[in-house]
C-alpha cells in the first residue's frame, strides 16, 4: 500500500519526461490501452440528475474536474470518481494497480480511465477517506438504519399532525351534545335494538305479486308490513329535525323542503348502521329485521341493494351515536334542495355542523386512514339512495294499491324531484 502511494508527490510535478529512445512522454498519458477502458466512459455526458443545493453551479470534481454531483467520502466529486473510489476500496483493488509511466499521469475527465493507479493516488491526495467506504454488511446495516429512521420520522410526523388537528371548541361541544341527544331521543330502541328486533318471517311473499315497469315484482304482503312502520319512522325524523339548533329558525317552507329531501336518506342511514353481518339483515325502525331480498321484493328494488351495501361498508367505521347524529344533521341541512329560499343561511348551518363534525372526528382518533373524507363520501351515497328512492316511489305509486300507502308517506314522498 505504502509502496503504491509513494509516488503521490509527483502529481504536481510539471516537468515532462523522456523515454530512453528520446521521445517525449505526453502528460496526458495514453498508457491504459484497451485493458483500462472499463468503468466510466472517456467523456462524462451531462446529466440532469439531482445536484445538491450546497454545490455551486458547474462546480468541478476535485479529482478529474468533471461536473461534481455532491460530497462523497469527504470530497466534492463526480459520480464516476465516487464509484471508482468505492469499488477500489470495497474490492481491495488498489494493491494490483500499476502505472507504466512512473505514477505521474495527469488525471482529468478525458484521461481518468487510462491509469487506475494515478487516479486512485489523486483520490487519496485530495482527501477522499478510505474509512468512509462501507463493506456489504455495513452498507446493508446502514440502509436498514436509514429506513428505520425514515419510518420513525413518518410516525412522529403523523402523531404530530394528529395532535395538531383541532378538537371541538366549548360551543361546538354544546352543539354536539344537543344533536346527539336529538338523535338518541328519536332513534327507536336505541342501543337495545338487537335484543328487541323481530325477524320478518321468511315465508313472507306468498301473496300475489304486482308487476313493476322495470321488471321487478312487488310482494304486496311485504310492502304492507313495511308501510306499518314507515309512519312512525318518518315522525321520528321530523322530531329529530325540530330538536336541532338553527332548524327552527328557518322559514316553514324551507323546513318542509329540507325534511322531504332528507327523510329517506336519514331513514336509510338509521337502517344501515343496524346492519347485522351474522344474520345478514337490516333492522328497520329499530324493530323489524329484514333480509336483502325481502326489502327488495317489498317495493324498494335496487334501492334495497344500495342500503345493504352501505350497511356493510359502514360496519368498518364503527360509528358512535354522535357521528350518526352529525351525519343526519349534515344531510338535513343540504342547501341544494330544489325550491329553498334561504340557501345561504342553510349552507352556513351545514358548514357549522360539518366543522363541529370534523373536530369531533379528530377527537375520536379513528385508526382508519383518511377516515374523515371516507365518511363524507357516505353522504354522497345516501344522497344517491334518496334520489333512487324518489324514482322508485313513482313506480310503486302506479303499481301498488293506493290504500296501502299511509297518508304521511304520500305527503313526504310525493312531488319529489327525480
From Swiss-Prot:
ZnF region ranges: NR C4-type: 61-81, 99-123
Alphabetized UniProt keyword annotations: DNA-binding, Metal-binding, Nucleus, Receptor, Transcription, Transcription regulation, Zinc, Zinc-finger
Region (Disordered) residue spans: 1-38
PROSITE patterns: NR_LBD, NUCLEAR_REC_DBD_1, NUCLEAR_REC_DBD_2
One annotated GO biological process: negative regulation of transcription by RNA polymerase II
CDD domains: NR_DBD_TR, NR_LBD_TR
Places the protein is found: Nucleus
Domain of life: Eukaryota
Primary location recorded for the protein, binned into one broad class: nucleus
Chain residue ranges for the region called Modulating: 1-60
Family listed: Belongs to the nuclear hormone receptor family. NR1 subfamily.
Function (record text): High affinity receptor for triiodothyronine (T3).
The protein's assembly and partners: Binds to thyroid hormone receptor element (TRE) weakly as homodimers and monomers, but binds TRE with much higher affinity as heterodimers with retinoid X receptors. Can bind DNA as a heterodimer with either rxra or rxrg.
Name of the protein: Thyroid hormone receptor alpha-A
Organism listed in the record: Xenopus laevis (African clawed frog)
